[in-house]
């Protein structure tokens, strides 16, 4: 088969969706002999030199602004991918909306439906397009890819997609190389948050809980926040520059994949208090590095962590502060959580994801 994958979310700084698509493409090309092409478009950003060779793919790059192309595709259903990038058997979108196609089987990706349950906490483009179009696009798709059984349930129950058209491609655990602790982490470790600073990540509750932790335990390790900021994060960033958090909380900005492992190597605990998560790749990364995880009990996080994490209501500031104090203060609890996380992470493989994706593409072509 000739496959085209929309790679645009991974073109710049790879966060959740971009990292998922990047690793899925890499696993797929290693596991199959299909001809894979990645599609990128941006007015300013170009694919890195050698990207195609590194992934084992062809690259089609167009100097079209992302927002312009998205508006045309989502609102006008034009131009078809054949006009933009050529003819393929399958075209795979990394998001819930179809890429227009005359001939290719159309595959979409849905991790969660947060844009339906809490649209005011999403970006403007998502608020504009996704709630109105997602259900119709999902029902028209020849196959829907999701990363968890939680996501599969949302797609079948809320969007009305038949279960046999939804394929769960769980991300694989990263193969960490046991690098040393990052130089900006003290020997006592750190409380770590990794993720884009968007509203649903619920960083405000983390800051509240960390402030309470420091009241109870002034010697608590620093809080490091690793992730790209957004306009909505301005209030959080102001808070960490002022007492009582100033000097104890640091925003590192986006940390690329090759440096993130060193952050985990020096972390005492990862905290992920999200209001919703379609997967929560950072929880899997932390478990793979032997770092205890405290996470919310929302979305896919209970499924992903599989009993290895401390789970809390994302609005429970006192509960989060107490959970942090327990792991910071008790080496035995921290070690038990680390062991459980390593065992859970070992159940996630990219080989399995690639095999499921191959079946999704094969079935999609048959339904075309």
Residue ranges and their predicted role:
Residues 1-368:
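Carbohydrate transferase catalytic cores enriched for Leloir-type hexosyltransferases
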